[in-house]
UniProtKB/Swiss-Prot annotation:
Residues 30-114, 166-399, 699-730, 791-824 are annotated as: Disordered. Residues 175-184 have a biased composition (Polar residues). This is Inositol 1,4,5-triphosphate receptor associated 1. Phosphorylated by PRKG1/cGKI-beta; Ser-386 showed constitutive phosphorylation in platelets whereas Ser-676 is only phosphorylated in presence of cGMP and nitric oxide (NO); Ser-689 is phosphorylated in resting platelets but increases in presence of cGMP and NO. PRKG1 inhibitor prevents phosphorylation of Ser-676 and Ser-689 in response to NO and cGMP. Part of cGMP kinase signaling complex at least composed of ACTA2/alpha-actin, CNN1/calponin H1, PLN/phospholamban, PRKG1 and ITPR1. Interacts with PRKG1/cGKI-beta and ITPR1/IP3R type I. Interacts with HCN4; regulates HCN4 channel activity. The modification Phosphoserine is found at residues 110, 386, 676, 689. It is a single-pass membrane protein. Induction: By silencing of the transcription factor BTF3. The chain crosses the membrane at residues 844-864. Pfam families: MRVI1.
Amino acid sequence: MGMDLTCPFGISPACGAQASWSIFGADAAEVPGTRGHSQQEAAMPHIPEDEEPPGEPQAAQSPAGQGPPAAGVSCSPTPTIVLTGDATSPEGETDKNLANRVHSPHKRLSHRHLKVSTASLTSVDPAGHIIDLVNDQLPDISISEEDKKKNLALLEEAKLVSERFLTRRGRKSRSSPGDSPSAVSPNLSPSASPTSSRSNSLTVPTPPGLDVCSGPPSPLPGAPPQQKGDEADVSSPHPGEPNVPKGLADRKQNDQRKVSQGRLAPRPPPVEKSKEIAIEQKENFDPLQYPETTPKGLAPVTNSSGKMALNSPQPGPVESELGKQLLKTGWEGSPLPRSPTQDAAGVGPPASQGRGPAGEPMGPEAGSKAELPPTVSRPPLLRGLSWDSGPEEPGPRLQKVLAKLPLAEEEKRFAGKAGGKLAKAPGLKDFQIQVQPVRMQKLTKLREEHILMRNQNLVGLKLPDLSEAAEQEKGLPSELSPAIEEEESKSGLDVMPNISDVLLRKLRVHRSLPGSAPPLTEKEVENVFVQLSLAFRNDSYTLESRINQAERERNLTEENTEKELENFKASITSSASLWHHCEHRETYQKLLEDIAVLHRLAARLSSRAEVVGAVRQEKRMSKATEVMMQYVENLKRTYEKDHAELMEFKKLANQNSSRSCGPSEDGVPRTARSMSLTLGKNMPRRRVSVAVVPKFNALNLPGQTPSSSSIPSLPALSESPNGKGSLPVTSALPALLENGKTNGDPDCEASAPALTLSCLEELSQETKARMEEEAYSKGFQEGLKKTKELQDLKEEEEEQKSESPEEPEEVEETEEEEKGPRSSKLEELVHFLQVMYPKLCQHWQVIWMMAAVMLVLTVVLGLYNSYNSCAEQADGPLGRSTCSAAQRDSWWSSGLQHEQPTEQ
């Protein structure tokens, strides 16, 4: 990697073994008595684009100017390397070294020193001296003007690229909270030492008596002593030498370039002169004359990244002063203090050097890493600072103290500080706009909103809000005694109202809601009513206690007000002896009158406050009451609707029970005994299904005529045991129309509301029993009537048949004529059965069985009648048959006639 320097200037081997270190150019060791860079800080070759313009002073030094070695130098275990010289004259030796220093035209500014190089960048001249190929002055090479112009153009282009890179959007600082160690161990090896940076270096020569392995302090080979921010590179200690004006001009140019690259904060123009004076003071500074300003064993190398290289274990007690000083200057609202000595050399009062609370280097500019919160004035934004970092930010403390300050004073201080900074640095406007992060803008906006909210709160605190919740939250007035306050606060927790503004807003019944709320549905109205009713019921339990508490608080407030006014009046009257002058007497009387007016106004204020509170409560409850009234109206409307439907159903049931053929239409189930009159057996009973109810309800609507109904609605009313409807017989239409028992309208069927099964169950038990008894009695009467008619028909037939032997032709004609009435009578019988028992007719198989039985009975009766008539005539006195030819030739009598001869 680098060259190991093993005591080439007469240092003992023991000390040299501990002080072996790598030479990587000018940044290897910036200060005599400090450690060099780690191996991570590699010596990479630098192209001309990354270098400084020629002519810039460089602190690289060749070992040619070293004095003769001195013997007897003791070594300490620390890796500090101090080259020996004349211990009696350290100042003269330093001046000699400065005079013999070789200036390099280039300065390393590239980031490539962070990478490790495998090749050495040093060489040895013919005289045996080590030459830094990067930083030391090399033999002049003849370059043409054209090449020089090209080099300058490349340098300018590199500058533009570097500026664009450094000012890119979203660029963060090079420093982060984790970069700077909180405590640096003194036993770190050179390879593990903290990384040094390019700028903000603070060099303090260490007195020879402070290091154990000490000689006179002298610069190391390839390690120029850089001043603060690389802006105070000294070319010669003597002001008479010609290099000083050139060095100052080069420093100005170097500063301008660093400002453009964002590595250095720009300074105001008036500070330039003081900076030059500070540079001279730093060059002529003798650490032996000011031993108290240099901490023991400490030679910090601070930089923009917040990193440092230390030789001593811990800082002295003087170093902890800087954190307090920074905090104090932050409170005063001025930028960080820059005395002439601190600006350039960083050496001044005892508190000018040191570290912050966490052991971080706190130079005048590098120390500004301890940021102040956004509400406090800050120095101009620096490229090397991060607004969102900083482990020792005193933000909460500053914010707490700042919140206690008056608002006007805070705004005045903030405006004055900002204006003063801009006046001191007029050239920073564009620079700050480019660098200001987004977070700063957000914090500024939040601060403005906070100020606005405070102003609004101050304006709104004229009178407290007249509500129970607000009184409970804000507590009792301050003039009450602590015991009374404690008692009231304890008792107040138990009597809080439940119907608060939060509940009203949640239920969307608060009057102060913006805009007109959409109307609530019936379900929402019901939910709101339930919650409000519960809240009202809960409030009713604590109403008396809340009234007593409010009255007691009101009385206490009035009494306290009266006491204060009386005390004020007493204090004025006690000072009546002081009012000697006539004008004073008038003022005295005026004050007494004002006190009386205040007394009356206080009483009126109390009464008006009660009225205002009552009106506000009425306003709060108005929407809630409106919602509850709406719910009651909905209930009333629903009740009227259900009641009307129920009455219609009862009326329809009564009408159906009064009909002779009501069971075919009303759908009311009949009992088993009413159905057993004709068939002799029980039919299965079924409840009327819900699907039947709409057709049933549509049969009896107001305004309908009894004969305006159509019969297709009837099949749904009759159900068979298997659930299949039977079509009505066409012959049933005239009978139904004659009796006028159907009065449904198909047009009204769709519009009629469908009654649910619950409406059927709402019928009283008495109505059901009465309807069943009426149906049973009517069925019984009709059954008896039909049975009687059948018996009459049979008797008539028998009478006619008995007369047939005397009048054979008439009997034959009457038999032919009776065929038609018999068929019609059968049809009437089937129709009667269908009307009486609709469920029986729904099954076609039962109908055919009944028809077959009737037909067989008719045939049997006919055969029986004809047989009897012929047998009686054969037994007559003439001894011969008098049957007619039709009877003899008929198919039922032919068999009998064949059987008679065989029997005779």
